[in-house]
Design a protein with these regions (language model features):
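Long lumenal/extracellular ectodomains of secretory and single-pass membrane proteins
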Residues: 2-456, 466-663
């Protein structure tokens, strides 16, 4: 089939979505469907290390119910007690079982294969944490897995600690120092802090941390305090400073134990005899380094006081401010009192402070929003989506126009950056089948709401619909499916509202979804299924379990959802479209096996996981039974993600330790 015909088909289908979206569908083809009454796969395949690793990923999904949600202390900070931040016991037990299964299966393999699979496990560990590029952005689950790996490969885990900064951030070191009891890991984390702070001090002071005197630190502090933003930027020009000074805990603040242990680690014992003096010297050094970084929090005070930093709220450069900083201080930067509507007279100034610099800060922020320069890519999609959802479900009652614009701008930046990355990847590796021909399918059944993952499903679905070659096309389903065409000219709040206008909270009738889609395809004379279905779900449309070792038992296969869908598509003259099962809730049943052709599996909430769906080189393949599918399977797709060159340093470090199977 020519590319012209393929483009024509997905264009026709996109047009059909637009027409159909005005009418909510009523599926007359289903006569009866019990809630969670279908069969599914009980395992990802035969007992192999690859299947165990994929099972681990399937369960490495941050639970949204019954998990860490500690209350703030009186000082406004969260407690550092590790018991307050933990993975639920049921999930720990589940993960423990799967990890041990991997260990047992891998230990029985030849040494070269052991090396291969343990290298993949360690790559996966850092993929689990990866904040930049494709990865799951998970903290607690990464800490859990890192500790499990340390129990098997202590020397290797210790050697990998410095790499954590490349995939996570300095706060991860704080967790290791406080919560992991192994002294080798704690020392490695403290040494990593020292390495970066020494490098920063060499650039700023011309000497390492312990050689900087209090007089030098005070002098530079005073000099920097008097500088304007542009002058500070000129001072640090050409210097590559880390964020260690920003993240190392402050005295009297959360995780201050890290600071105490670091001082004991970094400074000679003789110096520590006058500990109060060392603390004071260290404080001045860190303050100077933080000023060099242009940290926004330091400017969130009105200048003019003797000895204070002469950079105020108006000095914050909104187009350079990190997405997390903007999200955390959104109301303050907008100069708005939370949940207090602005009067007409306050629209330009805000209603929180009358200080000139606070008002200018608001104006600067609004200007940056209008120019489309506000950052949002690195935000936690789940947190951003839940903030949007909160306002949508309260009918936007306490949402100011400025806050709406700010949240929408950060959403748009996130979407735009992912689309740019996807387009660049596709251009670099053209595919016979364009991987961007994707239709998101959002499960809005009652179980999604019970698991509290419905908001994440909507967010990922809308994000996917925005970067797809079928822009705005998506399907929602509960008992009945709804064909939607999301207006891409509307902001994300309006898009959420459009999705929420459909049927929600009933049973999980996924069969009605593909039947409705087939009706649409046939009615509009679409000649091929040259698209992918990205199904965002908790997987609870199945309850019973069936074990199909290789997926070749046709009668059994036709009883599971994937088999039923393929049969229905074939009856209408279509091949099974590439199908992505996006799992949003850790559970023990699977919608396919690791080798099922035409299928991919994605697990988690990170927006960057969309890269594995919208990128890749795909062709068609026909098996001995005559089934034509896209030539991809869950294991191959997963393997491609974790063997990305970004994780090569992890593999190289494993080989360098020569520990166990890496010898």
């Amino acid at each position: 089939m020519t590319s012209t015909n393929m483009i024509s088909n997905h264009t026709i289908l996109a047009s059909a979505f637009k027409k159909e979206s005005a009418v909510f569908a009523v599926d007359s083809l289903i006569t009866a469907l019990t809630d969670n009454g279908d069969l599914t796969f009980g395992d990802l395949g035969n007992k192999t290390s690859s299947a165990a690793l994929m099972k681990l990923d399937h369960s490495m999904v941050r639970p949204k119910t019954g998990h860490y949600a500690p209350k703030k202390l009186k000082n406004g900070h969260f407690p550092s007690n590790p018991e307050q931040f933990k993975i639920p016991e049921y999930l720990v037990s589940q993960l423990d079982t799967i990890f041990q299964e991997f260990v047992t299966l891998t230990s029985s393999l030849p040494i070269n294969e052991q090396k291969t699979y343990w290298s993949l496990m360690l790559r996966y560990c850092f993929y689990l944490r990866n904040l930049r590029g494709e990865g799951k952005k998970e903290r607690l689950l990464f800490y859990y897995l890192f500790e499990k790996i340390h129990a098997v490969f202590p020397k290797t885990a210790e050697a990998l600690v410095p790499l954590i900064i490349d995939y996570g951030y300095f706060g991860d070191l704080d967790h290791l120092i406080i919560n992991i009891k192994a002294k080798d890991v704690v020392n490695a984390a403290l040494s990593t802090y020292a390495k970066y702070l020494n490098a920063d001090c060499l650039q700023v002071f011309g000497k390492e941390l312990v050689a900087v005197t209090i007089e030098q630190a005070v002098a530079l502090n005073n000099k920097l305090k008097a500088m304007k933003v542009e002058e500070v930027q000129e001072f640090v020009k050409g210097k590559k400073l880390s964020l260690a000074a920003k993240h190392i805990p402050r005295e009297g603040k959360k995780d201050q134990l890290v600071r105490k242990l670091f001082i004991e680690h970094a400074f000679p014992l003789d110096d520590q005899k006058n500990l109060s003096f060392i603390k004071q010297r260290f404080r001045y050094i860190i303050t100077a380094l933080t000023q060099c970084l242009g940290v926004g929090e330091q400017m969130m005070t009105t200048s003019g006081k003797a000895g204070s930093i002469q950079r105020d709220w108006a000095s914050i450069e909104m187009d350079r401010a990190p997405a997390g900083f903007l999200a955390q201080h959104r109301s303050a930067l907008l100069n708005e009192i939370k949940n207090t509507p602005l009067t007409q007279a306050e629209l330009d100034t805000g209603n929180r402070s009358k200080d000139a610099d606070r008002i200018q800060c608001r104006k600067n922020l609004m200007k940056t929003i209008l120019e489309g320069k506000l950052k949002g890519l690195q935000l936690d999609l789940s947190k951003l989506a839940r903030e949007i959802d909160k306002h949508v479900k309260s009918n936007l009652a306490n949402l100011s126009s400025a806050e709406r614009s700010m949240l929408s701008a950060q959403w748009k930046d996130m979407m735009t950056k992912i689309k740019e990355a996807v387009d660049a990847a596709v251009k670099a590796a053209p595919s016979t089948i364009d991987p961007r021909n994707v239709i998101p399918v959002i499960d809005l059944s009652g179980s999604m709401q019970s698991a509290k993952v419905d908001v994440e499903a909507v967010a990922l679905g809308l994000m996917g619909a925005s970067i797809s070659n079928l822009p705005g096309c998506l399907i929602t389903f509960s008992e009945k499916p709804t064909i939607l065409h999301i207006d891409q000219t509307k902001d994300v709040f309006a898009q959420f509202q459009q999705v929420y206008s459909t049927e929600m909270g009933y049973t999980t009738n996924i069969d009605a979804m593909y039947r409705k889609l087939l009706e649409l395809m046939v009615a509009n004379k679409v000649t091929s299924a040259d698209f992918a279905l990205m199904i965002l779900t908790d997987g609870h449309f199945n309850s019973g379990l069936v074990t199909i070792p290789d997926g070749r038992d046709l009668k059994l296969f036709e009883t599971v959802f994937l088999g039923r869908m393929e049969k229905a598509f074939k009856e209408h003259g279509y091949n099974l479209p590439r199908t992505i099962f996006w799992n949003l809730d850790a559970r023990g049943a699977y919608s396919a096996t690791e080798t099922t052709k035409g299928v991919q599996m994605v697990n988690g909430y990170s927006q960057t996981l969309l890269m594995s769906v919208f990128c890749g080189e795909y062709t068609l393949t026909t098996d001995e039974l005559g089934n034509t599918r896209v030539d991809v399977d869950p294991w191959t797709s997963f393997l491609k993600s974790i063997t990305n060159e970004r994780f090569n340093p992890v593999h190289q470090m494993c080989l360098a330790t020569k520990e166990g199977c890496f010898a």
